[in-house]
C-alpha cells in the first residue's frame, strides 16, 4: 500500500481585506484573503512539489434547499447544528491543486478566473506568489465544465489563461456539453439555469478547443504520475485524479463532495446540482469505501481549505467522517 504524502511547506497569506455585498447578514464581516487567513499551502507528494491554492469561496444562501432527499433535510440541519455550523447557507471552499516536477507545472481545475469579486478568483495571484507564471503551466485537468472549474482557463480578453498548457478532460464530458440536445431529467437544477449553463459551457469549450485533449478514465499521464479515474454523476464525464510519486499518493476527488459534514456522514445525501443524482450517490459510496479501506490521502475541491485529509469510517455502515490532515510548517 502506498503511504501517505509528505508535508514540507508553509501557509501563505497576502492581499487586502474587502467586503462582499453578496453575502447574507450572517457574513457581514470583511472578507477576502489577508495575512491572518492563509490561502496557499505547500507540501509534497513523493518527489513532486505540490500546493493547495484557494481560489476563494462561495456562500450558497439557498442553504439546505439544494440538498436531497427533501424529507431528510431535518437530519442534515441537526448535523450542522451539532457542529455549530450555520444552516441558512452552505459555505463552499474552492481549492486548486497545483503540482511541479522539474519543468512540468500541472493545475487541476482553474476556479473562477479573474473576476471583480474579492471572495473568488485568487488562483493567478497564488501562482505568482509561488513563482509560477501563467505561461509556465504545461498541463491542466478539467474535471468537469461547471463555472467554478472551467472559467479560470479563460482570461478576461477571452484568450487562454494558460497558453502553453494542454487541457485534459474526459470524452464523455466534452461530448455531452458540445452536443445539440441534452438530457437533464435526473437533476434538480433550475431549467432556466440549465440553459445558461449549456451556453456558458459551449462558449468556453469552443474558446479552449485548441488546447483540449480527451483522456478517458484509466488514462495515465506523465509517466504514471497522474491517473484519470471515473467519477461520473456530478456531471456526465466528471473525473477524479490519482497522483502517485515515489511510493506516495493523493486522490483528488474533485466534486464528489460539496460539504465536509453532510455528504460524508451520509453519502446518499445529494446536492441538486448533480447531473445524475443516483449515479453521483453510487460514485460517492464507491470512492468513500475504497479510500477509507485503503487509507488513501485525499484532496477535495470543496472541503475546508487546504482540502487535504482522509475519509474515516464510522462503525460498520456507510457513514464516514472527513478527517483533515494536520498542517506542518517547515
Where would I find each of the regions flagged by the language model?
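Active-site metal-binding motif and surrounding structural segment of the metallo-beta-lactamase
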Residues: 89, 118-168
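Divalent metal-coordination and catalytic microenvironments
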Residues: 47, 99, 109, 137, ...
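Metallo-beta-lactamase
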Residues: 26-29, 128-129, 136, 170-230, ...
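Active-site metal-binding loops of divalent metal-dependent hydrolases
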Residues: 55-56, 110-112, 145, 172-173, ...
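C-terminal segment of N-terminal export signals and the immediately downstream linker at the start
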Residues: 17-52
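Cap/insert and terminal regions of metallo-dependent hydrolase folds
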Residues: 242, 246-330
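Conserved beta-strand hairpin/beta-sheet module of binuclear metal-dependent hydrolase folds
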Residues: 39-130, 240-256
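N-terminal export signals
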Residues: 2-26
Amino acid at each position: 500500500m502506498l503511504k501517505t504524502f509528505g508535508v514540507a511547506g508553509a501557509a501563505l497569506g497576502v492581499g487586502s481585506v474587502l467586503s462582499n455585498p453578496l453575502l447574507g447578514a450572517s457574513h457581514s464581516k470583511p472578507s477576502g484573503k489577508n495575512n491572518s487567513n492563509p490561502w496557499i499551502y505547500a507540501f509534497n507528494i513523493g518527489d513532486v512539489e505540490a500546493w493547495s491554492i484557494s481560489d476563494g469561496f462561495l456562500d450558497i444562501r439557498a442553504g439546505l434547499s439544494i440538498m436531497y432527499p427533501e424529507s431528510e433535510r431535518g437530519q442534515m440541519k441537526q448535523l450542522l447544528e451539532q457542529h455549530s455550523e450555520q444552516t441558512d447557507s452552505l459555505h463552499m471552499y474552492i481549492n486548486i491543486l497545483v503540482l511541479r516536477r522539474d519543468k512540468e507545472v500541472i493545475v487541476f481545475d482553474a476556479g473562477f478566473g479573474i473576476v471583480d469579486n474579492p471572495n473568488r478568483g485568487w488562483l493567478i495571484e497564488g501562482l505568482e506568489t509561488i513563482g509560477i507564471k501563467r505561461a509556465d503551466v504545461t498541463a491542466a485537468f478539467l474535471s468537469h465544465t461547471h463555472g467554478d472549474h472551467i472559467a479560470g482557463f479563460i482570461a478576461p480578453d477571452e484568450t487562454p489563461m494558460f497558453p502553453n498548457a494542454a487541457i485534459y478532460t474526459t470524452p464523455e464530458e466534452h461530448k455531452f456539453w458540445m452536443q445539440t440536445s441534452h438530457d437533464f431529467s435526473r437533476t434538480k437544477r433550475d431549467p432556466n439555469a440549465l440553459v445558461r449553463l449549456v451556453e456558458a459551457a459551449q462558449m468556453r469549450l469552443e474558446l479552449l478547443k485548441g488546447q483540449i485533449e480527451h483522456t478517458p478514465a484509466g488514462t495515465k499521464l506523465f509517466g504514471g504520475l497522474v491517473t484519470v479515474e471515473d467519477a461520473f454523476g456530478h456531471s456526465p464525464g466528471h473525473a477524479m485524479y490519482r497522483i502517485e510519486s515515489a511510493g506516495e499518493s493523493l486522490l483528488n476527488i474533485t466534486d464528489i463532495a460539496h460539504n465536509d459534514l453532510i455528504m460524508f456522514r451520509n453519502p446518499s445525501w445529494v446536492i441538486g446540482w448533480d447531473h445524475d443524482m443516483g449515479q453521483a450517490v453510487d460514485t460517492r459510496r464507491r470512492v468513500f469505501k475504497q479510500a477509507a479501506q485503503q487509507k488513501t490521502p485525499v484532496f477535495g475541491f470543496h472541503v475546508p481549505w487546504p482540502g487535504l485529509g482522509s475519509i474515516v469510517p464510522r462503525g460498520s455502515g456507510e457513514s464516514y467522517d472527513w478527517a483533515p490532515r494536520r498542517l506542518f510548517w517547515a
